[in-house]
Amino acid sequence: MSFDIAKYPTLALVDSTQELRLLPNESLPKLCDELRRYLLDSVSRSSGHFASGLGTVELTVALHYVYNTPFDQLIWDVGHQAYPHKILTGRRDKIGTIRQKGGLHPFPWRGESEYDVLSVGHSSTSISAGIGIAVAAEKEGKNRRTVCVIGDGAITAGMAFEAMNHAGDIRPDMLVVLNDNEMSISENVGALNNHLAQLLSGKLYSSLREGGKKVFSGVPPIKELLKRTEEHIKGMVVPGTLFEELGFNYIGPVDGHDVLGLITTLKNMRDLKGPQFLHIMTKKGRGYEPAEKDPITFHAVPKFDPSSGCLPKSSGGLPSYSKIFGDWLCETAAKDNKLMAITPAMREGSGMVEFSRKFPDRYFDVAIAEQHAVTFAAGLAIGGYKPIVAIYSTFLQRAYDQVLHDVAIQKLPVLFAIDRAGIVGADGQTHQGAFDLSYLRCIPEMVIMTPSDENECRQMLYTGYHYNDGPSAVRYPRGNAVGVELTPLEKLPIGKGIVKRRGEKLVILNFGTLMPETAKVAESLNATLVDMRFVKPLDEALILEMAASHEALVTVEENAIMGGAGSGVNEVLMAHRKPVPVLNIGLPDFFIPQGTQEEMRAELGLDAAGMEAKIKAWLA
């Protein structure tokens, strides 16, 4: 969309942070208003992450106004909230392309802009990276400042606390800004906090604080009295004791929507030495009433009409695989009170809303804590319960040692319901579910299942739930099911595939939900088609039978070729000295960028036309 200068006259003056810093203070509230309206106008036309960015408009303006970015280094955690940052750093006219194929990256991305210091997408990484960047800046000796912005959800993760503990030990010069959009601030308390925060962050207070420490360091009673007095003053504002104990100078909470107040506080804190912590209060969805009332629904949005405030409703077509999982979960829980379901802050995305309402005492949202989620499940299994960990493929990576050490080694019956497996689309490199088959397949005692449709998905969930000899995993994609009939639940024979079509010369071994496209290829080439179902254990007898009766084999999966299901087939053939040509079709050896699932599958040759072309070229 073209930029309307008349509609956004102040924002039109800002196409870089250098231009932003030329604006007088009194024009900044108007800039924030225009930036918020432009964000609404852009995202409603193009889709994208929405509510988080509305809540960080004033913070973004204040940070770029006070700090000399990009020389000073600003790090955003996760990046959902960074759309205003992109708009102010030379990408205003491209914001309508965000999350689209060939467009702006959905998160801060180092290859896109010098303002994007850290490529992000997963949570809770900013402080760790920020410490490293701050240490490097100190050694560089150019007085380069480091700022990390982290949300109240991301800061609950263990990695964030590990980083803060380290920062308190080595004491780098850096600022951590906690963007807290969970609490509401009353006008009076907010005003008091803002005033005290400015006092506590000011140079006079800082000088008195450090000078007093030096003067009275040899007089323990007075030193202790001063420390307690300072704690009491800060206690009038908020209980920031935890961050103080970790070694940070804590300031806040302050109103995150008062841009001029933020600028004053940030200027005061900019030159303070050691690790600093600024706690700001914001409202997710700020300035757009529907998003303020329902920030979860408006977290990421499709195209919508901002005047109505209504998001387009589902067409009522086929259910998503997440819905299939959620329905199975409720159905099974109603029959078995030993079922326990765990999610690391992905209730809506994993299809668990209904379960959380029907079975609240058996539903555990552990927040952004994937490592804890898996070991918590291990403990439930030891206690005689039947835990199910519902988790995205890309986030299970964060708990790999826990899967190995706490679940698999002990042969605990934990079921992993792995959503968003394969290509996920608009969130790009950081969110593709490209690696789960590779990183799980090498774990002893693990059963791995790849359904080809929603009925198989249900049967495999049922099979994994009743498998008591160790952990099991069922992986399924983002998107809708294919519309097959749902049959009564029954346990599948472990490690057994089925032949779907008999052909000649060529056999295609399919793993997972690319089956509809693979079936078209098999029909076109008159190839035998096998639904392998299990990646581990593989149906070795069936593989050897197919190798003996066909001239060539093709494996198909929506996972990295390296170490994936096809690699497992290769290993079986080599172990049995079967010199049969094999073509492995799957995800290539690079990080898959954003685009719709259909666009990326076509580009990577994972639609029917692409697979057929690959096979014909290989056979030629």
Curated annotation (Swiss-Prot):
Keywords: Isoprene biosynthesis, Magnesium, Metal-binding, Thiamine biosynthesis, Thiamine pyrophosphate, Transferase. Gene3D superfamilies: 3.40.50.920, 3.40.50.970. Its cofactor is Mg(2+); thiamine diphosphate. It catalyses: D-glyceraldehyde 3-phosphate + pyruvate + H(+) = 1-deoxy-D-xylulose 5-phosphate + CO2. Binds 1 Mg(2+) ion per subunit. One of its GO terms (biological process) is thiamine biosynthetic process. Thiamine diphosphate binds at residues 80, 121-123, 153-154, 181, 288, 370. This is 1-deoxy-D-xylulose-5-phosphate synthase. Mg(2+) binds at residues 152, 181. GO terms for molecular function: 1-deoxy-D-xylulose-5-phosphate synthase activity; magnesium ion binding; thiamine pyrophosphate binding. GO terms for cellular component: cytosol. Its EC number is 2.2.1.7. Pfam families: DXP_synthase_N, Transket_pyr, Transketolase_C. It is an enzyme of class 2 (transferase). Belongs to the transketolase family. DXPS subfamily. Homodimer. Catalyzes the acyloin condensation reaction between C atoms 2 and 3 of pyruvate and glyceraldehyde 3-phosphate to yield 1-deoxy-D-xylulose-5-phosphate (DXP). NCBIfam families: dxs, PRK05444.2-2. Pathway: Metabolic intermediate biosynthesis; 1-deoxy-D-xylulose 5-phosphate biosynthesis; 1-deoxy-D-xylulose 5-phosphate from D-glyceraldehyde 3-phosphate and pyruvate: step 1/1.
